[in-house]
């Protein structure tokens, strides 16, 4: 049974049993704690946690997953892979243990004719959690599994949790006995190579507390509702159903290995080392295609680094196998042709995937050539000196100059019997990051060379900041730069950077935006200040434009800030402190500040959190903040020693470095933080705070965006107007709106389903007419045509196969149908066995048609799919297919 059929059969089986089929989510995880989706349940986490209402009580999916922790083991074992498809069925408070177990048993053991996978029940072994008497009783008494094929295991093997406090529960695994050639008897507790796990049923019924590892945590109690989360590895089931030794020999990976052997001349099975490389190539190329297809591009951080690492390992292993030229395009085309049957978007997005992959291949081949020479020289020098450790600076050079990921250097060094000074490498990497941050901060002033600012600091001393007490004041120009170059004077229209001996202007820092305003000279000259930065400690650089007159160093000036803007920013900054404290009160000290920006009338606050903050918690936080405003608490600032500040429990601000004396901002009895920013005098001055929402900005970091003061009021006023309009439209009170709108959307969805059903029936009804239209081309029945626009790929495929099946007499048959979906042409072509014996293969025909359509395609000899960009060329594509059939038949 092909992988595509396993996938189709899974979804069909559970849909027939009341489950709503949900498409695979993107591999890019919508979860700050994850770079990529590693399990089928990840897209459903909000439902299990009660944060979002599930789309249905029963759901099924086949989820794309990527896991890379064991990447070094890929190819060396027959079970490790970076990409896999997780088939899952989920229940949110609906059926529980007995229902999940019954469904799993039926799916695996029902005959193929009855929609199951037809596994031999005698080869299935069950594991249950040590104390789960209920699950064992169901397996034994309800299903009929003999007691000797049911084994109890501990928390490590048969108890599931997310690794943090939250839902958890015992699980039951279904294992398949592959026979004595894979090891000794004794069940999965003894030999997991012979008794391979294929399906895990998780019974989420408890809430766990904090703890370490898979076993050391307490059970706090029962969950309000009991849920089911199951996962079956599609590749593992394919291995069994296709009767192969390991997952690399299944249909979707073997074709990639076959292409790699074709490109290198190496035979699979000849020797272990080349087999490992072939398996690495097959796995990594497939993973690369799936990642690029979901929008990941190679890079040096996060998901991009995962992709780059995987692609470069694949390319290098092709080199180890003897490949000399570019190989990536040939390999990814095989993956797209194969996986495109299950994920048609890969076929339509082929060009972009190829472009991204080929660019990375070109970059790495260039890097590999130069970097390998450097590495070989370094290895030779190290060995000649009697060393066994490659220096960290060599690894850094390879990374910085040639783009070698550290794990590639580790791997290549190990092949030469050397280890690598990883600590030294990481130290140099950190030094580079620190330098980059310093340069970025300097460039923010418009001039990366800090010498001019240091010279001003050396001659004139630090700028005295007077902005805490006053919004304007007299000063003197002690430094002047025009277009980044020191100058004694500047004239009207010049872009300038001005340094004063004292200033009321706040320089950007601590998350607070800089003040803006004007600097006036006695001569009438005016500088409009647009930004203020501190490129070196103690020096305020005022960036702006000379609007009128001439400005000279040494001239007396009067500096004044935009007071309205300053007050709006101060409100935002004080609101940020209140939000920080309210979040810590709600979530605990882990909700530490990770960044902020305070601008006029609005602010954003970044904080640590392993998961999204529930909407109810955000509502409570907002209410708490506004309660504090109504208490009219005084806001006070005091300078004290850092030790005294710590004793008082003051919270340090993210990203700031502090000296021995620090400024502490205290808001009544509610908040106390180290802060150099400007604030209101009393919380009543904030007026109102409105949290707009919360989102992820990275792994383990969330962001709240909010409005304060008049901006918050204006937002609520607009919302009130919208609510009033909705009331008028649906004829209901505000509290009735969600239910009424949900009902309307439900009716709309039902109507769309009916339309879709009618359209599908109409398409299939055309089958008889299409059969009658068949042409005889040199003894081959050829059916071509264009079906109504908007026909889905699945419906088009069903129609093509239906028409092919109706052609009688055992004569050769080719069916090629076309449609337009979302403005793009789509074709599915099928051939029967008699046609294939004449050399008429669906994949060849599709490639011919798709080329005419301005795209690409592929598939199996019996059925293939393609698409393009030019729907006007469908007639030409039909003609091209007819010509090829005529020439071949």
Curated annotation (Swiss-Prot):
Keywords: Aminoacyl-tRNA synthetase, ATP-binding, Cytoplasm, Ligase, Metal-binding, Nucleotide-binding, Protein biosynthesis, RNA-binding, tRNA-binding, Zinc. Its EC number is 6.1.1.7. One of its GO terms (biological process) is alanyl-tRNA aminoacylation. Binds 1 zinc ion per subunit. SUPFAM superfamilies: Class II aaRS and biotin synthetases, Putative anticodon-binding domain of alanyl-tRNA synthetase (AlaRS), ThrRS/AlaRS common domain, Translation proteins. It comes from Streptomyces griseus subsp. griseus (strain JCM 4626 / CBS 651.72 / NBRC 13350 / KCC S-0626 / ISP 5235). Catalyzes the attachment of alanine to tRNA(Ala) in a two-step reaction: alanine is first activated by ATP to form Ala-AMP and then transferred to the acceptor end of tRNA(Ala). Also edits incorrectly charged Ser-tRNA(Ala) and Gly-tRNA(Ala) via its editing domain. This is Alanine--tRNA ligase. Its main location: cytoplasm. GO terms for cellular component: cytosol. Its cofactor is Zn(2+). Gene3D superfamilies: 2.40.30.130, 3.10.310.40, 3.30.54.20, 6.10.250.550, Bira Bifunctional Protein, Domain 2, Threonyl-trna Synthetase, Chain A, domain 2. It comes from the Bacteria. NCBIfam families: alaS (TIGR00344). Transmembrane segments: none annotated. The keyword Ligase applies.
């Amino acid at each position: 049974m092909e992988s595509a059929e396993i996938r189709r059969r899974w979804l069909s089986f559970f849909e027939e049993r009341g489950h709503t089929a949900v498409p695979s989510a993107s591999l890019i995880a919508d979860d700050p704690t994850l770079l990529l989706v590693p399990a089928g349940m990840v897209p459903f986490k909000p439902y299990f946690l009660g944060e979002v209402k599930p789309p249905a009580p029963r759901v099924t999916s086949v989820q794309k997953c990527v896991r890379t922790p064991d990447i070094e083991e890929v190819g060396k074992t027959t079970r490790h892979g970076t990409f896999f498809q997780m088939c899952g069925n989920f229940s949110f408070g609906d059926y529980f243990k007995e229902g999940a177990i019954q469904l799993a048993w039926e799916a695996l053991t029902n005959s193929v004719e009855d929609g199951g996978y037809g596994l031999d029940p005698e080869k299935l072994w069950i594991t249950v959690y040590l104390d789960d008497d209920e699950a064992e009783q169901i397996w034994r008494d309800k299903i009929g599994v003999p007691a000797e094929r049911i084994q109890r295991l501990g928390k490590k093997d048969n108890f599931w949790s997310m690794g943090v406090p939250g839902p958890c529960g015992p699980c039951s695994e279904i294992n398949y006995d592959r026979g004595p050639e894979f090891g000794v008897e004794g069940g999965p507790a003894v030999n997991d190579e012979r008794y391979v796990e294929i399906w895990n049923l998780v019974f989420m019924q408890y809430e766990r507390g904090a703890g370490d590892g898979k076993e050391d945590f307490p059970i706090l109690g029962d969950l309000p509702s009991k849920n089911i989360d199951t996962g079956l590895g599609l590749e593992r089931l394919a291995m069994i159903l296709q009767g192969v030794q390991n997952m690399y020999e299944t249909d979707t990976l073997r074709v990639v290995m076959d292409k790699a052997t074709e490109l290198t001349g190496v035979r699979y099975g000849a020797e272990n080392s080349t087999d490992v490389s072939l398996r690495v190539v097959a796995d990594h190329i497939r993973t690369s295609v799936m990642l690029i297809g979901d929008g990941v591009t190679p890079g040096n951080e996060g998901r991009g680094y995962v992709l780059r690492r995987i692609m470069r390992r694949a390319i290098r292993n092709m080199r180890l196998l003897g490949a000399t030229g570019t190989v990536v395009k040939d390999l990814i085309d095989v993956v797209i042709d194969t996986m495109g049957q299950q994920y048609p978007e890969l076929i339509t997005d082929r060009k972009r995937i190829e472009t991204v992959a080929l660019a990375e291949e070109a970059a790495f081949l260039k890097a590999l050539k130069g970097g390998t020479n450097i590495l070989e020289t370094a290895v030779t020098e190290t060995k000649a000196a009697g060393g066994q450790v490659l220096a960290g600076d060599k690894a850094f050079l390879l990374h910085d100059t040639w783009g070698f990921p550290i794990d590639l250097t580790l791997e290549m060094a190990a092949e030469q019997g050397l280890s690598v000074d990883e600590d030294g490498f990481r130290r140099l990497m950190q030094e580079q990051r620190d330098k980059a941050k310093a340069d970025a901060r300097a460039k923010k002033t418009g001039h990366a060379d800090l010498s001019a600012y240091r010279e001003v600091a050396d001659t004139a001393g630090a700028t005295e900041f007077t902005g805490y007490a006053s919004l304007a004041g007299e000063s003197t120009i002690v430094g002047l730069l025009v277009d980044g170059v020191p100058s004694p004077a500047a004239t009207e229209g010049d872009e300038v950077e001005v340094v004063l001996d004292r200033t009321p202007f706040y320089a950007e820092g601590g998350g607070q935006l800089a003040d803006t305003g004007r600097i006036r000279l006695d001569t009438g000259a005016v500088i409009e200040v647009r930004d203020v930065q501190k490129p070196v400690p103690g020096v305020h650089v005022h960036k702006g434009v000379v609007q009128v007159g001439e400005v000279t160093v040494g001239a007396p000036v009067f500096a004044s800030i935009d007071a309205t803007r300053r007050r709006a920013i101060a409100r935002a900054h004080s609101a940020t402190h209140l939000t920080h404290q309210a979040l810590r009160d709600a979530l605990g000290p882990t909700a530490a500040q990770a960044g902020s920006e305070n601008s006029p009338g609005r602010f954003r606050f970044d904080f640590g959190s392993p998961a999204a903050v529930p909407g109810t918690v955000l509502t409570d936080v907002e209410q708490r903040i506004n309660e504090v405003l109504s208490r009219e608490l005084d806001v006070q600032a005091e300078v004290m020693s850092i030790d005294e500040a710590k004793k008082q429990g003051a919270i340090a601000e993210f990203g700031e470095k502090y000296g021995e004396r620090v400024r502490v901002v205290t808001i009544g009895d509610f908040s106390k933080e180290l802060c150099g920013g400007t604030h209101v005098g009393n919380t009543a001055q904030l007026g109102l705070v409105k949290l707009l929402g919360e989102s992820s900005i990275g792994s383990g970091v969330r962001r709240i965006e909010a409005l304060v003061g008049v901006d918050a009021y204006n937002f609520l006023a607009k919302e009130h107007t919208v609510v009033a309009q909705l009331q008028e439209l649906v004829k209901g009170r505000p509290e009735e709106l969600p239910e009424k709108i949900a009902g309307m959307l439900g009716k709309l969805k039902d109507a769309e389903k009916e339309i879709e059903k009618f359209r599908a029936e109409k398409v299939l009804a055309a089958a008889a007419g299409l059969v009658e239209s068949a042409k005889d081309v040199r003894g081959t029945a050829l059916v071509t045509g264009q079906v109504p626009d908007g026909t889905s790929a699945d419906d088009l495929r069903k129609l093509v196969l239906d028409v092919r099946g109706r052609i009688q007499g055992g004569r050769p048959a080719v069916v090629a149908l076309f449609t337009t979906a979302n403005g793009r042409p789509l074709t599915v072509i099928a051939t029967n066995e008699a046609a294939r014996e004449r050399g008429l293969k669906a994949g060849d025909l599709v490639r011919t048609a798709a080329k005419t359509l301005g795209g690409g395609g592929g598939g199996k000899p019996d059925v293939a799919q393609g698409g393009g960009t030019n729907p006007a060329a469908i007639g030409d594509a039909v003609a091209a297919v007819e010509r090829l059939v005529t020439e071949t038949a």
